[in-house]
Amino acid sequence: FLSVAATLNFDYLNEVAAPLANSSARVPFLDLIQHSRSRALLENAGYRSFALSSGLLFTEIETADVYLSPHPSPFNELEGLLLSNTLLQLPLEIMGQEAYLPGYRAHQERILYAFEALSQLPAVAGPKFVFAHIIAPHPPFVFDRTGASIQPDRTYFLGDADGYRGNTVEYL
C-alpha cells in the first residue's frame, strides 16, 4: 500500500510521507490513498470517482462517489469475524443480517467481482477515476496458475507467504 500512496500522489514515498512525521493518525497512509492528489485533481475536473473493495483496510476508498463491493455489509472483515464468534451474532441473525466473514471463498469472490465490475464500468457515461487494488498477486493465493479456484488447507490469513510455490513469475 505504500507504493499505492506514492503513485496516487505523484511523488516519491519519502516526500509523500514527510507531512506525516508528526501525525497522530493510526493509519497515516490511509488518508493519502483515500484523499490522494490524483483523485482530487480528477474530481475537480468533473470526473466521478469509482472504487472497488480491496478487502484491505489500507486501500479501501469508501468515500468515492461510487463504492463497489461484492459483500455489502455494515461490518468490515475483522468486525465480522469478531461478531461471528460471540453472542452478538444473535441479533444479526434475528435482523436477517450476516456478519461478513473473511476467508478464501470471499477473497476469490472479491477478485472475480472486481474484474467483472471493471469490465462494466466503460459503459457508464462520463469521465471516471477508477481505483481498483486487486489483491491477487499477493498471498493468500486463491487461484492456481491456470486460474482455477483453490482452497488452501490452512486458516485464511492475508499475509500468508507460505502460499508461494515455485517462483514469482508463475504468479504474474
Q: Where are the model-predicted features located?
A:
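Catalytic domains that recognize anionic headgroups
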Residues: 1-172
